[in-house]
From Swiss-Prot:
Group of enzyme by EC: lyase
Organism: Geobacillus sp. (strain WCH70)
Role, per record: Catalyzes the conversion of urocanate to 4-imidazolone-5-propionate.
Family: Belongs to the urocanase family.
Protein name per UniProt: Urocanate hydratase
Annotated residues for binding of NAD(+): 49-50, 127, 173-175, 193, 198, 239-240, 260-264, 270-271, 319, 489
Swiss-Prot/TrEMBL GO biological process terms: L-histidine catabolic process to glutamate and formamide; L-histidine catabolic process to glutamate and formate
Catalytically driven reaction(s): 4-imidazolone-5-propanoate = trans-urocanate + H2O
Cofactor note: Binds 1 NAD(+) per subunit.
Keywords assigned: Cytoplasm, Histidine metabolism, Lyase, NAD
One example GO MF annotation: urocanate hydratase activity
Active site, per annotation: C407
Key word Electron transport present: no
Length: 552
């Protein structure tokens, strides 16, 4: 078996290497997930989120690439947990790739069983966009993070975070977006991170302003910026399970508090308190059970500190990494006393079919993205909030790998935008086709009772039919590749979710596929929330003419 890191070819430009643009897009996006500017550990095929991978191993990666290069326009490649297992003759409107990652029968859906299978080389953790080949670096989460903190500001601080301090932890692929999202909302952020390389990476990509390894210096800088009403983000080298209790000890209580460490995966995503990175790596190899025990104890202390800060006035929320569940399992009974970010701040957007819609320039030329920015500013000029986001993104966000953009578009808006982009490709206004996709964290594509579907109005938090329906609908609609994953964001046993990607290659056939997929995909999100009894979703379904046979 080939286990050695291979150099990954970053294909750009308008020259085809595969037999069609959809296969080419899948190849370029797979490789983009492993681009050194994008992936957390490309040498291990790890893209983000603990051990979220793009392919099971290097042998599988090589076979996927070879298959995509030779895949016909009426064939479909099947990927089973990062391994290419079959190619079948289908038809030209069918997806070119169907992906199923990390799916386990519910009674076996534990990290222990997953790790057993992983050791045997039988499974891979796909996270959300790692194994579905549509990760675009920290920008992929930054608008969602910006929207979350904007809603925190609206609910608690009069519409701005100016004059407030946010404390959080974790500066990996997801958490790395937090400091920029806070400063874009005018606030001050102290982001605790145990790995100095991750802090430096966020400084290099302008997601973070400065760093220190001293708590007193971080607090001093934060307080000064708060008093002066300035936006500032500070990376603090340390372990949150140690830093937060010290903050309480010295009487420092932040205005806003959250966390985006990879607590969903205690073995690979959380460093136990009192250990260096090297000591942690050694223990993880030597005695994984002891490592997990120590990591879970640290997570419990971390959550206890969050609860203590909440009691002293911090606006506190879980940012979707299942940290509350891990702490509760460790005996922290009050762990769920602070809410998850979706029910607290994001669900109204889901009711309108809005979610993290993204597009990528396969040409590799930033100008293609800037031209699409102009389309948003022109065609959606009545949406001031959206236009402000696009202007800020152009100014503040550095591309990682292939140039990309993200913005939250809803039902009707996505299909409209998709047609415009396809027309631009057809007219030669863009140098190559555009890939359109989204996070699995979307309005109708995930069942995750501790995150996206926490506290549903009708109690349907754990019903996983919706993401399965979403994947089926996207496949029959003609998405370019469709994925069904388990355990993304919150870990084994806690979520089922689906992804879709569709290519705008300028053809009339693509125009029809885009119209279908970019209507039904967010449409199911509206349906899922209307079915659960949300008035805004019911209103949206009626206004948009979405046919729900039992909607009163």
């Amino acid at each position: 078996m080939v286990t050695k890191h291979r150099p990954v070819q970053a294909y750009t430009g308008s020259t085809l290497h595969a037999k069609g643009w959809i296969q080419e897009a899948a190849l370029r996006m797979l490789n983009n997930n492993l681009h050194p500017e994008v992936a957390e550990r490309p040498e291990d095929l790890v893209v983000y989120g603990g051990i979220g991978k793009a392919a099971r191993n290097w042998e599988c990666y090589g076979a996927i690439v070879e298959t995509l290069l030779n895949l016909e326009n009426d064939e479909t490649l099947l990927i089973q947990s990062g391994k290419p297992v079959a190619v079948f003759k289908t038809h030209t409107d069918a997806p070119r790739v169907l992906i199923a990652n990390s799916n386990l029968v519910p009674a076996w859906a534990t990290w222990d069983h997953f790790h057993e299978l992983d050791k045997k080389g039988l499974i891979m953790y796909g996270q959300m966009t790692a194994g579905s080949w549509i990760y675009i670096g920290s920008q992929g989460i930054v608008q969602g993070t910006y929207e979350t903190f904007a809603e925190v500001a609206r609910q608690h601080y009069g519409g701005t975070l100016k004059g407030t301090i946010t404390v959080t932890a974790g500066l990996g692929g997801m958490g790395g977006a937090q400091p920029l999202a806070v400063t874009l909302n005018g606030g001050v952020c102290i982001a605790v991170e145990v790995d100095p390389a991750r802090i430096q990476r966020r400084i290099d990509t302008k997601y973070l302003d400065t760093m220190t390894d001293r708590l007193d210096v971080a607090i001093q800088m934060a307080k000064r910026a708060k008093e002066e009403g300035k936006a500032l983000s500070i990376g603090l080298l340390g372990n949150a399970a140690e830093v937060l209790p010290k903050m309480i000890e010295i009487g420092f209580i932040p205005d806003v508090l959250t966390d985006q460490t990879s607590a969903h995966d205690p073995l690979n995503g959380y460093i136990p308190a009192g250990m260096t990175l090297e000591e942690a790596a050694e223990l993880r190899q030597r005695d994984p059970k002891q490592y997990i025990r120590r990591a879970k104890q640290s997570i419990a202390e971390h959550v206890k500190a969050m609860l203590a800060m909440q009691k002293q006035g911090s606006v506190t929320f879980d940012y979707g990494n299942n940290i509350r569940q891990v702490a509760k399992d460790e005996g922290v009974e009050e762990a769920f006393n602070f809410p998850g970010f979706v029910p607290a701040y994001i669900r109204p957007l889901f009711c309108e079919g809005k979610g993290p819609f993204r597009w990528v320039a396969l040409s590799g030329d930033p100008e293609d993205i800037y031209k699409t920015d102009e389309v948003i500013l022109r065609e959606f000029s009545d949406n001031q909030h959206l236009c402000n986001w696009i202007r800020m993104a152009r100014e503040k966000i550095q591309f990682q790998g292939l140039p990309a953009r993200i913005c939250w578009l809803g039902y009707g808006e996505r299909a409209k935008f998709g047609k415009i982009i396809n027309d631009m490709v057809a007219k030669g206004e863009l140098k190559a086709p555009i890939v359109i996709g989204r996070d699995h964290l979307d309005s109708g594509s995930v069942a995750s009772p501790n995150r996206e579907t926490e506290g549903m109005k009708d109690g349907s938090d754990a019903i996983a039919d919706w993401p399965i329906l979403n994947a089926l609908l996207n496949a029959v609609g003609g998405a370019s590749w469709v994925s069904v994953h388990h355990g993304g964001g919150v870990g084994m046993g806690y979520s089922i979710h689906a992804g879709m990607v569709i290519v705008a290659d300028g053809t009339k056939e693509a125009e029809k596929r885009l119209e279908r997929v970019l209507t039904t995909d967010p449409g199911l999100g509206v349906v899922r929330h209307a079915d659960a009894g949300y008035e805004l979703a019911i209103k949206t379904a009626k206004e948009k003419g979405i046919h729900m046979p039992m909607l009163k």
